[in-house]
Amino acid sequence: MDGRASRWQSHREERRRELIKSARKAVHALGSDASMEDIAAAAGTSKSVFYRYFGDKAGLQQAVGEVVLSQMQRRIQEAAQSAQTPREGLFAMVSAYLQMAETSPNVYTFVTHYTPGDAQATNGTIATAGALGHFFAAISDMIARPMRSHLGDGREAVIGYWPNAAIGLVRNAGEQWLASPASPSKPDQEAMARQITDWLCLGIAPELRTAAPNQTSPTTAPTLSEPKKEST
């Protein structure tokens, strides 16, 4: 590549970074469903410029997602590395995730969900490909590494399945919390992070042990292995 071509490439990369930054600010202010026209207007340019650099809205979501999710991944990794125990590590990671998402729910939703057209084609499922897929794969590996050293050999099934299951719990609970309007019953970020960490480590066993006395006892309730007997 000659000097002129190199300068042009550098200019395009810089312009692309500027557009991503402007789009992020616009989405933060306007909402996750902001149109390309609205985003371009907020950025002080035309939507044709955004189409030229990103192709379509999904391409812009992908580009913004690469930046946002990379920052989230670094923050979560730093939080995990500062922990002294596995449980502290989980809490630190969950807390960092919620903090980053809470910083701008609009931007978080913009980079983790398909555009309306794409959602219709995929039955409205949440995006898990591209930058988002890489993000969750990296977080899963981040969880699995200390588990492997802590649990030792012979626990491949736990190490293989649990990190992804944990991510599903954290993400779904976190997104529901993020979308919930403020109310006296809504926990703050730290309380929500601790609650999710407790669910990851203990499940809902503590709540079951403190169930009301008139509720069915787990020892007498029918189970899958012991069906309820029919009365004669």
Place the predicted regions along the sequence by residue.
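Hydrophobic alpha-helical connector segments
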Residues: 78-106, 166, 190-193
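Short hydrophobic clusters on alpha-helical segments that form packing/core surfaces
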Residues: 19-27, 68, 72, 97
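Short hydrophobic/aromatic patch on the recognition helix
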Residues: 43-54
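Amphipathic alpha-helical linker/stalk segments
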Residues: 64-90, 112, 121-122
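Alpha-helical DNA-contacting segments of helix-turn-helix folds
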Residues: 58-71, 111, 132-135, 139
